[in-house]
Amino acid sequence: MTLMNKSPQRIRHETRLRILEVVSVRPVTPLMLRITLGGDDLEGFASPGHGDHIKVFFPQAGEDIIVPVLGPEGLTFPAGVPRPEMRDYTPRYHDPRRRTLDVDFVLHGDGPASTWAAQARVGQKIVIGGPRGSLIVPDDFDWYLLAGDETALPAIGRRLEELPSTARAIAFIEVAGKDEEQVIRSSASVDIHWLHRDGQEPGNNGLLLDAIKAAELPDGDCYAFIAGESSMSKAVRAHLVSERSFKDEWIKAAGYWLRGVADAHEPH
């Protein structure tokens, strides 16, 4: 690969908490819902990076939303009331003019996020915080590699949609089955490889790593975004560096979840 100075730039944002309400709920696939949030609190919201994440505060069952206080020592919650569950989510699409924000939720299990999303109705309120920062990746790499499972699909889909027409991208996306494939529109030259688990366990099947190992990848300078189960992301990164001669600083490998751990999200 040709050595070039294309280091991604990290920027920080003022951390704010926002009270939003559900504007619409619509299925993207049988196992993924797109929930549009809106409200005047989105004034000043910024999310320039496809890998950004917001913190969503899910109230306990039967409880109203709770807005913590953000101070120098972090978040402080009111005493005597159940704390909300907090999870990280990708801002899928932000419309500053309409003051709306799309967030995609994977429906799996009975965790707080899936449970809330499955019952979400127009007018319900929810609290979000962030993003605290963004990683800005230049648009002039020779090509882009994106790989991940359903948890990474909002970030991958957003990146593909935001790439310019001059860009080239190859994506490997692991989903439960063919019904979980999504329509992703992009101006760039995009090649998407959908990998179906078809009953295999997520995060423990080798689908993504095996597919990337077997792929004939282009020459040139590449930026790689890998996200999903933590051990998978690390294994793909190791393969790209040791066997494909990718520059480590041109790889973002994020662990969005960890097998056997209910709430595991590496900072990014």
Residue ranges and their predicted role:
Residues 1-268:
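Extended, composition-driven regions rather than compact fold-specific motifs
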